[in-house]
A protein has these predicted regions:
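A penicillin-recognizing enzyme superfamily signal
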Residues: 87-180
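Short catalytic-loop micro-motif centered on adjacent basic/acidic residues
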Residues: 47, 80, 167
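Conserved catalytic neighborhood of penicillin-recognizing serine enzymes
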Residues: 2-60, 104, 116-146
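Mid-domain, small-residue-enriched loop/turn segments at the edges of structured enzyme/sensor domains
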Residues: 17-24, 54-93, 107-109
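Secondary-structure transition/capping motifs at alpha-helix termini
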Residues: 1-3, 70-72, 100-105
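Soluble periplasmic/extracytoplasmic beta-strand elements of cell-envelope proteins
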Residues: 4-6, 80, 112
Length: 180
């Protein structure tokens, strides 16, 4: 959370031959910026530097698998900016893992089947496993709270008056076709 990276222009490799010069959503640059501040402000340049300087793309892919992702995710620098798509249910389960202190629970659509008298015919129990240690997830979740409380997700608080505890990560696709 306190690690600092340079908030300056860089080159991202999308594949072996394609390069891209990403920008922060507001076009800003800066000096050394903490990971917490980069996440709070949704700074693309900081996200890419995490991949280029701290964590290899292949390790991010493995973490994604541990958090329940089954879709193909390309192990390239641009992974930091969402170069690969994932199923909404899988990303929801991944966020659930963060909320659940690092315990991943496989999503279930049906938890039990009852007859017309309420007797249980079949019960389904979600598969759960620890995929990340609680201390690491605590730091991540705390950083994500700053997105909602004082960052790019702040409209949840000031515009919609949502007061319950919340954590999040904002982002948009190119041309703002999707916004999460």
């Amino acid at each position: 959370a306190t690690t600092e990276l340079l908030n300056q222009p860089l080159i991202v490799f999308i594949d072996d031959t394609t390069q891209w010069n990403p920008q922060n959503h507001d076009g800003s640059t800066g000096l050394l910026t903490t990971l917490r501040e980069g996440l709070r402000r949704s700074l693309n340049l900081i996200s890419v530097r995490v991949v280029q300087e701290l964590i290899e793309p292949k390790d991010i892919v493995q973490n994604a698998k541990d958090f329940g992702m089954t879709t193909y995710i390309r192990a390239v620098d641009a992974i930091a900016l969402g170069v690969s798509e994932v199923y909404p249910l899988e990303i929801t389960a991944a966020y659930g893992t963060i909320a659940n202190n690092g315990i991943y629970s496989r999503p279930l659509a049906i938890t039990r089947i009852e007859d017309r008298h309420g007797r249980i015919i079949k019960e389904f129990i979600p598969e759960s496993k620890e995929v990340q240690d609680e201390a690491t997830v605590y730091i991540l979740r705390d950083m994500m709270k700053s997105v909602v409380d004082a960052g790019t997700g702040g409209a949840l608080r000031w515009k919609y008056k949502f007061r319950a505890p919340a954590a999040g990560k904002t982002g948009t696709t190119n041309s703002k076709a999707d916004a999460w």
